[in-house]
């Protein structure tokens, strides 16, 4: 079976994670895909297949005889999809020989256009997979799952010599907790790769340092007709806080290694208001400087409006795994070589986000990220090509060969 055929089977299984849930997994529906994958892993000849009660799925492919002493290499992808855009009733559409221009998705008003996604012109002539424009596609990260499964199948069918291989599929990556309950010892790999990137050939090992920053503003509400010098409008204070941040240090104004403050949500009345940010930077010192800026704003606002008006809570999320990967750069060197062997241009890029591999690297499993061939995740424009998926399978297959040498 080809990777895209598996993807088409997987995306119709609904698996949104829920950031407001206190359970693990955050949504019971993730077990629906996990059980399907559990059965498929067993059919493919994986051993020690275990689906635990927190929806982590593990399996192993024992080494070819004589290669048992080679490093155990793991491959990881996540089962959940985002819940911040419609994920109900996903209807994938396959467009053969895409012309590289504007494409209406199904009967929706959603137009996939090179004006917004210039790389589309490079996909001319390929077979393009999209949703019908009303939902996400779910290639993030079911494409990664499909490619890992297809690689395992190919190794078995073609009897490709290999060292010990480990496979895991995780829940809740999209809400930042995918690695929280990952059992590294159970997994059994010395090194790992997540397949959770974009363009085929992507190699990523420098991710953001990340935290959440939550402001709660307490106002003082009196009748507006008699409030001179007494009213404190919490919503206006919230506006002051946001205006105190560097105006260009937002996702829209930054790229590559540049960090940002991102206002995720806000709410407010006169009496109380809230601002919820995520803060990101690749550079550790610049990241710390951003947190100091937030604390200084809190201090300034309380000096202006009265102590206790503004309360800031900063919650750490994840760190840049580059410091861990720097100790085992063979992971990157071999990934580059695997791309070249698969006739794919290696693209070493910073991750403007995070993956399960970020946290796993700090739990003792160095784990850079590889591309799957997908684009424009987390919305109705999400798309991937059959050819990109095939090449991603080629890359991980070549990786397996390199670690068996």
Q: How does the language model describe each region?
A:
Residues 121-208, 248-268, 272-282, 288, ...:
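Acidic/histidine-rich catalytic neighborhood of metal-dependent amide-processing enzymes
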Residues 67-161, 189:
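Active-site metal-coordination/substrate-binding segment of hydrolases
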Residues 2-28, 130, 318, 378-379:
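N-terminal capping segment at the start of a domain
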Residues 235-405:
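Metal-dependent amide/peptide-bond hydrolase catalytic core
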Residues 121-135, 218-222, 342, 374-378:
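Glycine/charged-rich beta-loop-alpha catalytic/anionic-binding loops adjacent to active sites
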Residues 194-227, 231-237:
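Phosphate/diphosphate-binding glycine-rich loops and adjacent basic-rich segments that engage nucleotide
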Residues 68-69, 223, 284-289:
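Short, conserved charged micro-motifs
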Residues 22-70, 74-76, 80, 91:
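A non-catalytic alpha/beta surface segment that caps or lines the substrate-entry region
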């Amino acid at each position: 079976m080809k990777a895209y055929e598996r993807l088409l089977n997987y995306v119709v299984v609904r698996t949104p994670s829920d950031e407001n849930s206190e359970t693990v997994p955050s949504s019971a529906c993730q077990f629906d895909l996990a059980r399907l994958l559990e059965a498929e892993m067993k059919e493919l000849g994986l051993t020690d297949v275990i689906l635990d009660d927190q929806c982590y799925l593990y399996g192993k492919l024992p080494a070819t005889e004589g290669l048992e002493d080679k490093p155990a290499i793991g491959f990881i992808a996540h089962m959940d999809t985002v819940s911040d855009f419609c994920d109900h009733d996903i209807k994938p559409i396959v467009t053969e020989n895409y012309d590289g221009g504007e494409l209406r998705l199904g009967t929706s008003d959603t137009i996939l256009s090179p004006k917004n996604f210039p790389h589309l012109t490079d996909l001319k002539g390929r077979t393009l997979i999209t949703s019908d424009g009303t939902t996400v596609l779910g290639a993030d990260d079911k494409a990664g799952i499909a490619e890992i499964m297809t690689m395992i199948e190919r190794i078995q069918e073609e009897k490709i010599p290999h060292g010990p291989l480990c496979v895991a599929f995780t829940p809740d990556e999209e809400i930042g907790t995918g690695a929280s309950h990952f059992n590294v010892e159970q997994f059994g790999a010395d090194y790992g790769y997540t397949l959770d990137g974009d363009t085929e050939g992507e190699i990523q090992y420098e991710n953001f340092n990340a935290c959440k920053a939550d402001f709660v503003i307490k106002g003082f509400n009196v009748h507006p007709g008699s409030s001179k010098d007494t009213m404190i409008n919490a919503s206006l204070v919230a506006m002051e806080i946001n205006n105190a941040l560097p105006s260009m240090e937002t996702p829209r104004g930054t790229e590559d290694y540049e960090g940002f403050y991102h206002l995720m949500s806000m709410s407010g009345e006169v009496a109380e208001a809230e601002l919820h940010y995520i803060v990101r930077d690749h550079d550790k010192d610049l990241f710390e400087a951003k947190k100091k800026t937030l604390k200084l704003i809190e201090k300034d606002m309380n000096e202006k409006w009265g102590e206790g008006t503004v309360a800031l809570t900063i919650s750490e999320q994840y760190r840049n795994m580059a410091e861990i990967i720097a100790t085992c750069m063979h992971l990157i060197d071999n990934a580059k070589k695997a791309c070249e062997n698969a006739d794919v241009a290696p693209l070493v890029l910073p991750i403007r986000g995070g993956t399960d591999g970020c946290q796993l690297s700090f739990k003792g499993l160095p784990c850079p990220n590889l591309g799957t061939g997908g684009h424009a995740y987390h919305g109705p424009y999400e798309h991937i090509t059959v050819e990109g998926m095939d090449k991603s399978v080629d890359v991980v297959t070549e990786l397996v060969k390199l670690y068996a040498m």
